[in-house]
């Protein structure tokens, strides 16, 4: 858990296995990834509640489902989504709740989530690969495809060496763009 005071105040805490409600799933976390956003939360640069469980990206397995859950079965492989309350369209402030920021995150063995807070993992990806996709991969996709409207044959400048840049490089190349 994060504690006011930054990285040197992080704590490992033992807790009981969480209980779920009717519309929730219990996920055993297989892998999680650290993004720049997570670092900012841990450093206190992004204000959050004291004792927040960090990390917003993960992969895992559904190990229990609530009575009214219809989308998932025990054993399903899932990955996190950056903004679980934002389904489509332009983001609105009320949809921008971020797991690991305004809600407890994936730096845990088990997490309880609404059934709508996750999506299926891509086929052929390992749990570790999947855990890198939600924030960095989708940020790169949004920048290049949704906002940038990148087409084959166009040239794109990709700056940086972090997760978003690496995904942007791979996406641009796979789309037939020239990367500088």
Predicted regions and their residues:
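Extracellular beta-rich ligand/substrate-recognition surface
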Residues: 1-9
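Glycine-rich beta-strand-centered segment in the early N-terminal region that forms part
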Residues: 16-32, 42-87, 102, 122-125
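Alpha-helix/helix-capping structural signal
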Residues: 32-34, 67, 116, 138
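A short, glycine- and basic residue-enriched loop/turn
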Residues: 37-39, 147
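Mid-domain Rossmann-like dinucleotide-binding core that forms the NAD(H)/NADP(H) cofactor-binding site
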Residues: 78, 125-180
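Cysteine-cluster motifs in flexible loop/terminal segments that predominantly coordinate metals
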Residues: 84-109
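Structured surface patches comprising rigid loops and adjacent beta-strands/short helices at the edges
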Residues: 112-120
């Amino acid at each position: 858990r994060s504690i006011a005071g930054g990285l040197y105040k992080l704590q490992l805490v033992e807790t009981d296995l969480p209980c779920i409600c009717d519309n929730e799933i219990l996920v055993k976390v297989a892998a999680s990834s650290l993004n720049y956003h997570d670092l900012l939360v841990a450093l206190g640069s992004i204000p959050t509640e004291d004792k927040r469980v960090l990390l917003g990206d993960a992969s895992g397995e559904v190990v229990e489902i609530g009575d009214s859950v219809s989308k998932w079965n025990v054993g399903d492989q899932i990955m996190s989504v950056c903004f679980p309350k934002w389904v489509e369209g332009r983001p609105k402030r009320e949809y921008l709740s971020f797991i690991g920021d305004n809600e407890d995150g994936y730096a845990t063995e088990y997490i309880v989530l609404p059934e709508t807070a996750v999506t299926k993992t891509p086929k052929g990806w390992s749990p570790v690969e999947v855990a890198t996709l939600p924030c960095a991969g989708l940020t790169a996709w949004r920048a290049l495809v949704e906002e940038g409207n990148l087409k084959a044959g166009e040239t794109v400048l990709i700056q940086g060496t972090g997760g978003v840049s690496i995904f942007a490089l791979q996406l641009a190349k796979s789309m037939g763009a020239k990367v500088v």
